[in-house]
């Protein structure tokens, strides 16, 4: 009896996860891949690509180094 309950619960969880994945993919397609009437990608997709490319080119490394003249720490940003 307990195995039947666990099997039913596992099936329900699997169905919910599957529906969630399908709904997420549908939303991504709807928001990001929706082409305008002129055949160009949507502005949201273009903006996302631009931000992704900008993020790759402007990654920064933050190091917290102690300042020798005081007890406070200064934060230095170094571009990679």
Curated annotation (Swiss-Prot):
Chief location bin: host cell
Keywords assigned: Host membrane, Membrane, Transmembrane, Transmembrane helix
Localisation: Host membrane
TM region positions: 10-30
GO CC, one annotated term: membrane
Top-level taxon of origin: Viruses
Topology term for the membrane: Single-pass membrane protein
Record has Transmembrane as a keyword: yes
UniProt name for this protein: Protein UL148B
